[in-house]
Amino acid sequence: PKQYHPKLVSLAPSFGIRVWGIANAILFAFSNLVKTTRYTRESFSYRKFLGKYKRMYTLRLPYKSYEKSRNVDIKNDYIFFLSTLWYNDEWNKNNEGVNKTRANFIRACKDIKTIDFEGGMVSSKLSQSSNRLFADCLYHKTIAMKTWLYKTCKSFVVFNTPAFWNCHGWKLAEYLTLGKAIVSTDLSNDLPAPLINGVNIHI
């Protein structure tokens, strides 16, 4: 309700990082599992619970990795952009929104002969029905997070657009952390401090 809007606090964009090393990740995973099973009455999946700790360690990097990556030399004719091809249905209409916007950027980069473009959209089982529409924009390789970070830092510009359900994706926060030159479509949500067109973002 609108009368409660003044009480709402806008959150800053954020992204996942590796919080602990392997030993502490295992320790906290199982100690928190014991606490959860002891105090909750609801049934839950042990596999999903422990899987979150596994993904935190295997798929994310420590914050220090982002700080160190700021020193990577930028290649002035190189653009790297890798993103998710989200599944589409009658409610989210991602093929008319985020998927289409990302595809337009990818196609524009590929059409500019003086740009060395690398990347695309990564499909999943859920988004198979959209593959045909964006076949020319799909990326079929798997890369490590360290590689993604290095190539993103090497890119002379990065691209941002509101993601699933118009949320601020992790990439916006990662780009800001890395101090990248950001090209973006209009932001869909308020921020604690606005990003100003022509100052810290180009919309």
Language-model segments: residues:
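Nucleotide-sugar donor-binding catalytic core of glycosyltransferases
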Residues: 1-169, 185-193
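Conserved donor-binding/catalytic loop of nucleotide-activated donor transferases
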Residues: 153-155, 176-180
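A short acidic/histidine/glycine-rich donor-binding loop in glycosyltransferase catalytic cores
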Residues: 198-203
